[in-house]
């Protein structure tokens, strides 16, 4: 309401400070991975729901959970590194274990843990029937991603 929006999708990012939460970003759109997470976990089409709302229709609510889903962007080790190489065989194996994945860094790229999530080596979406299976699958993919990237101090 503070932005004048009364319908549609919004994406707001907060940081928690000693003084309390602070809004750092407000967007008139859904957040980066929300569409894929809802589609894979509930079979829900968020884009359709947004379109229905824009047309003045009440969108159907998401149905029950069909699968557990997580979007993961593993952070690199603490410090400044350069990507010396990427083992495409291992990275392909990692992404074959995920529902979807992409590398965010390539050989020669600088990786600096101080810059936050833009330092992520890759991003991927995993799903599973149970929470335990989801965590196991996420751990497997994450381990392979870290094996695939060769980092050297920058």
Region spans (language model):
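Active-site "cap" helix and flanking loop/linker of ATP-utilizing ligase/carboxylase catalytic domains
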Residues: 1-12, 18, 27-82
């Amino acid at each position: 309401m503070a932005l004048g929006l009364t319908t549609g999708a919004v994406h707001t990012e907060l940081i928690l400070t000693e003084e309390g939460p602070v809004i750092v970003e407000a967007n008139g759109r859904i957040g980066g991975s929300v569409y894929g997470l809802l589609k894979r976990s509930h079979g829900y089409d968020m884009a359709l729901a947004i379109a229905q709302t824009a047309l003045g229709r009440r969108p159907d609510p998401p149905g029950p959970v069909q699968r557990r889903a997580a979007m993961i962007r593993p952070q690199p080790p603490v410090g400044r590194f350069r990507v010396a190489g990427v083992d495409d065989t291992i990275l392909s194996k990692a992404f074959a274990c995920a529902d979807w994945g992409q590398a965010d860094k390539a050989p020669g790229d600088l990786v600096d843990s101080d810059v936050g999530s833009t330092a992520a080596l890759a991003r991927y979406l995993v799903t599973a029937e149970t929470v335990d299976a989801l965590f196991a699958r996420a751990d497997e993919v994450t381990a392979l991603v870290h094996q695939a990237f060769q980092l050297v101090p920058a």
